[in-house]
Each structure stands twice: as C-alpha cells, then as structure tokens.
From Swiss-Prot:
Catalytic activity: 6-carboxyhexanoyl-[ACP] + L-alanine + H(+) = (8S)-8-amino-7-oxononanoate + holo-[ACP] + CO2
Entry EC no(s): 2.3.1.47
GO MF term set: 8-amino-7-oxononanoate synthase activity; glycine C-acetyltransferase activity; pyridoxal phosphate binding
Keyword check for Acyltransferase: yes
Gene: bioF
Gene Ontology BP terms: biotin biosynthetic process
Keyword field: Acyltransferase, Biotin biosynthesis, Pyridoxal phosphate, Transferase
Residues that coordinate or bind substrate: H133, T353
Cofactor or coenzyme needed: pyridoxal 5'-phosphate
Domain of life: Bacteria
Identification of the protein by name: 8-amino-7-oxononanoate synthase
Amino acid sequence: MFDYSIFAKEIDELKNQGLYTYIRTLESPQGAWLVIDGKKVLNLCSNNYLGFANEERLKNAAKQAVEKWGVGPGAVRTIAGTFSLHNELEETLAKFKKVEATIFLQSGFVANQAVIPAITNEEDAILSDELNHASIIDGVRLSKAKRFVWKHRDIKDLEEKLKEAKDARRKLIITDGVFSMDGDLAPLPEIVELAEKYNAMVMVDDAHGEGVLGSHGRGIVDHFGLHGRVDIEIGTLSKAFGVLGGYIAGKKELIDYLKQKARPFLFSSPLSPADTAAALEATKILQESDERVKRLWDNAKYFKEEMKKLGFDTGESETPITPVMLYDAKLSTQFSKELFEEGIFAQSIGYPTVPKGKARIRVMISAVHTKEDLDFALEKFEKVGKKLGVI
C-alpha cells in the first residue's frame, strides 16, 4: 500500500516554515462582512471588487435562467451544449470590451490553458513576464513553443528576448495586466510598440483589471487607449463580475479558430445557465454605470493613504490591491491570525504564491466597503502592527 506519510511530512514542513494555508469556511454570502466560524468579520481578502457576488439583479437573473433553461448545459458546446443565452453573453462581452468577438470558458485559468497551446507550436516563441500568473505559466508549459522569460516589466529585457526569438515563425508576448500580488500594471503601451516593431502578437491577462480599470471597468486595454492593438485579452467572470468563468476576447478569426482547436472548449461542458445569466447581468450593470468602479477607487485611495500614515509598507501598487509587506512568512501568518481575532479577515500570502522573503497581507478593498468599515480596519491594523512590532 502507498505510504502517504510522505505527504504528512511535507505538510509539517510547510507549517514549520509558516507556509501552510489554513482554509477558512464562510457561513454567509460574499460581502463587506462575513460570518466565519460563527464570528462576524470584515472581509478584506475577496476579489469581489464591486460587490456583485451577492447583488440582487444577478441573483434574480440566475433564478430566472434556472426556470427557463434548467441547471446544466448537458453537453459540450460543440455537440448540444450551446444555448442562445451563451451566445448572448459572448456578444454582450464583445460589445463591452470593444472587440470583434469573445469565447467564454469555465474559468480564467482555463482560458489561458485554452488559447496558448492552441495558437503556438514548436516553430514559435513565447515571451512571458517573470511574474505572470500560474495559469499563464501552466498554459505555456502545455505549448511546444520555445520559451523566453523576461524580467518583470523590463522593456529593455523584453526587446533583447525578442531579438533572440527573431527566427521564430510566430512570437507571442504574454503579460498580466494587473499583477495580482503587488497591484502594479504592465507597461502595456511600451509592450505594444515593441510587438509592432518585431511583428509579435500581444496577449494580456486582465483578470484584476476587469471591472476595475478603464471606462466602466473595461480593463487595461481601455485604460491605456489601446483598442485594436492588443491581439488577445483574457478576462475572468469570477472577480469583479462576481460569478464564475473566464473568456478570451479578440478578432473574429481568432475566436472562430479557438472554437475548433481549444481543448477546454471542445472537451468540457460550459457554464451553467445560472452562471451565464448572472455574468450577463453583471456586464449590463457595468455598461449602464461606472458608479461602483469610482467608489472602489475612492475607497482604495483612502485606505492606502491612511495605512502609509500609520507607517505600513504598502508596496508600489497602482490599483485597489494593497499589499501590506511583512516579508517574513511566520510573521505574516501570525499577523493574519491576530487580525482575525480582532474581527478582520485578511489572509497571509507567502511562497509559492509570492517569492520567498516577500510574504504579505494582501488587502482587497471593494466598492461595498463603507468609510466606517475602512476606519475599523485601520484601527485594527494599527493595533496588531504595534503589538507585533511592525510599526
């Protein structure tokens, strides 16, 4: 019989290093406040940027979809699993993103695994930022293309890598739009200029830019005014949109090709009618108003400014993501536990999610937080920070 003690030993080692992830169980819907282990806590670590995860309009849309379409698609989309509701979501997303077409997948993670190996082979070169998301890294691993990893946000290094890849049939530059652990932005205008100079494609994963950046939350491409110059946009429906799923946006020819070649599209069932309808409703709300997006930024600006006044190191974030840098993994884990005891739910992030020696509490501000919520958080961060000698 297999000896499972090897896994137990590895788990013990993770605990000793302060790298073991303790998974909390929610006993309430997503929102500014949660109930965990019977305790009411302020939620500072979800990706529910705009509060859509428990929004009445989305819930009603999901209920109506279940009544009309049932609970599941019943097949993959290429056989008998494409409802007109699915097509409506893709068409609405395309209009919202100002692209020709979109295709949605089961998650943003899956979207990266779908597109990268589908459009590259051993004759091609992929150039990837060193801090790109795990889903991009795994997508690149599924491709047979030659790989070049360029230094984080370093345009000069990217150009050197493009020169090294000059003999490739096709060159694909991939970057996160917003880097999820630090909150910094990709230098997308400079990347696009290099891509045009070296005849390369540009792909941006905008998981943390959707609903956050640009007019009405259209994302980083809109933020920089680069419509028509970025070949592939990857989006998620599980963060600011508050639901589930991911999508690929771009030229109609690309999307048609992916419907024939992308393995997750071909061999796995699509989103349920409820998820599809809720995501569609979220898109409609964003099209109607950017009030929530503005409120999100106002909240984030206030919280960051006050945290800096208290003496916390909040990194170089350019977005509502606020990393509270503690560096030591054990300290970060203890800080998170102390915050929870004070009524704050803010998880510690350590290796391998971030490099060793870069542990932090990643604070995620949302549009549904009130000033009173944020002041409560600031009070508790100050208390724990002083207790643990951080400030």
